[in-house]
Amino acid sequence: MTPLLELKDIRRSYPAGNEQVEVLKGISLDIYAGEMVAIVGASGSGKSTLMNILGCLDKATSGTYRVAGQDVATLDADALAQLRREHFGFIFQRYHLLSHLTAEQNVEVPAVYAGLERKQRLLRAQELLQRLGLEDRTEYYPAQLSGGQQQRVSIARALMNGGQVILADEPTGALDSHSGEEVMAILHQLRDRGHTVIIVTHDPQVAAQAERVIEIRDGEIVRNPPAIEKVNVAGGTEPVVNTVSGWRQFVSGFNEALTMAWRALAANKMRTLLTMLGIIIGIASVVSIVVVGDAAKQMVLADIRSIGTNTIDVYPGKDFGDDDPQYQQALKYDDLIAIQKQPWVASATPAVSQNLRLRYNNVDVAASANGVSGDYFNVYGMTFSEGNTFNQEQLNGRAQVVVLDSNTRRQLFPHKADVVGEVILVGNMPARVIGVAEEKQSMFGSSKVLRVWLPYSTMSGRVMGQSWLNSITVRVKEGFDSAEAEQQLTRLLSLRHGKKDFFTWNMDGVLKTVEKTTRTLQLFLTLVAVISLVVGGIGVMNIMLVSVTERTREIGIRMAVGARASDVLQQFLIEAVLVCLVGGALGITLSLLIAFTLQLFLPGWEIGFSPLALLLAFLCSTATGILFGWLPARNAARLDPVDALARE
């Protein structure tokens, strides 16, 4: 009869300083299907090392070990994991159940790594627990079960994928005599069902119940009676068959890894929350700075637009501060008419200004009087709270009419509800009020200077007595390049004057400078916020590294029941990403609260969240999880299952 497990001259040595300590010294052993074998020996005799090699948790230094004719030395790590998953079931002295999983969930773990569908897993786990008398304990956690019940859960887990070979390491060592007898009775039943049962023990009474007792001493077999030949041995029971297609198996495996990661995080809620805190603050900082910074930029640009955007001012002289008399009369009314005819001009308004006294009844105030055209208010985006602007008839007739700003209205008419039609003195000229320009709220503040506007023909002809203009403001049509328009304007006036006795001031350049400045400032603040996100990511990495250390035994258990290194890597990586994703979602929520609070205190700000900003925040948190979760996950995947199981 061909042995199920065949060992020939197995040796296992470990480094100890500069030397090699040989634990197993030429072990040769055959174990047949359906046998119940006990391996006995004193502590340090090498029986646990032999069990680890039998269960494919460890590899021999030399020699040959075959499982059902397959030489395990030719198998890589994933193939060994598959061999453990499909052929072996482990029963440990300390049960080695995962504390954050219920009895039913613990039993399901081997089938998760076998790729069995959830419904099939659940039915099989319930069936096994019922067979072992735990049908009313399926939802209990290990801490709620007695030692005997925990060991029965461990046995059910060993049988989940079929458990052709049951490896029991001191299965009764931590139990009272009654529970120990129950466990041994179950092992006898498994033997009767066709399982191969290998018990590692130092208890003579337990060993006596086996069909064959193999004694090991100082790494050598000193007693090995011949096997009892069995007829019609099934060689195990109900092996689990996975019929799920490759793609569905991948999706199912990912979902299970996600579920296991969530359970692991939920088992340590406070630590998980504290780990998330750095990500929450980082994401909230990034999103808030981007969103609030954008709102502030729009507010600044709106204030600049209120001054007049897409406009070009033309002044006499060579530059600001040039008071050369030969240039002061450079701009004429004919220049204004020529400019208004250009195809790229939306509107053009002249300006003639002088500081004058305004009087109404017994109120006498100083103000800046500006002679403009009716287009002036359109050029600067100003609206009216009362009345309207000048019409062409008033401009042509040098009408004695005036438009007030809201500050002037309050000074001259503090108690009047409607001031249109009232007459005031502008200098020594009576003028009828035809409108009140609405005050624009600006983050730069309001001007302290009182301002009034008259038709430029009235201002120059009736008030100042001059035939030239102090300046011309041109509004460029939408769609035309402001810089190109400025060049054409300069060319036009230079041809008309025969020389360049004027200079221009393009507000579009100011706008672009402000936009560049705000972008730079926003980038700087975003980088500061990103640093806080990186700090949060490092916090995640530190906690995950600690988690790997704390959960080393759990990793060993998962590997013992068939988890591949990639399964462990995936689970810990998903845990890190999950922490960062949930932290990112909470960070976005926090940034929404910050924005809502700012909106209450700054009603003029338009704070909005674009879908792109939210998507980038989620991508950022996911990338943080992958980046800073990789090292801990890799460390977890590289753990040796024997070393991992040995740690507490």
Swiss-Prot record:
Belongs to the ABC transporter superfamily. Macrolide exporter (TC 3.A.1.122) family. GO terms for biological process: response to antibiotic. The chain crosses the membrane at residues 273-293, 523-543, 576-596, 600-620. SMART domains: AAA. One of its GO terms (molecular function) is ATP hydrolysis activity. Gene3D superfamilies: P-loop containing nucleotide triphosphate hydrolases. InterPro entries: AAA+_ATPase, ABC3_permease_C, ABC_transporter-like_ATP-bd, ABC_transporter-like_CS, MacB-like_ATP-bd, MacB_PCD, Macrolide_Exporter_MacB, P-loop_NTPase. Homodimer. Part of the tripartite efflux system MacAB-TolC, which is composed of an inner membrane transporter, MacB, a periplasmic membrane fusion protein, MacA, and an outer membrane component, TolC. The complex forms a large protein conduit and can translocate molecules across both the inner and outer membranes. Interacts with MacA. ATP binds at residues 41-48. This is Macrolide export ATP-binding/permease protein MacB. It comes from Shigella sonnei (strain Ss046). Its EC number is 7.6.2.-. Pfam families: ABC_tran (PF00005), FtsX (PF02687), MacB_PCD (PF12704). It is a multi-pass membrane protein. PANTHER family: MACROLIDE EXPORT ATP-BINDING_PERMEASE PROTEIN MACB, MEMBRANE COMPONENT OF TRANSPORTER-RELATED. SUPFAM superfamilies: P-loop containing nucleoside triphosphate hydrolases. It is found in: Cell inner membrane. It is an enzyme of class 7 (translocase). Keywords: Antibiotic resistance, ATP-binding, Cell inner membrane, Cell membrane, Membrane, Nucleotide-binding, Translocase, Transmembrane, Transmembrane helix, Transport. Part of the tripartite efflux system MacAB-TolC. MacB is a non-canonical ABC transporter that contains transmembrane domains (TMD), which form a pore in the inner membrane, and an ATP-binding domain (NBD), which is responsible for energy generation. Confers resistance against macrolides. Residues 5-243 form the ABC transporter domain. GO terms for cellular component: plasma membrane.
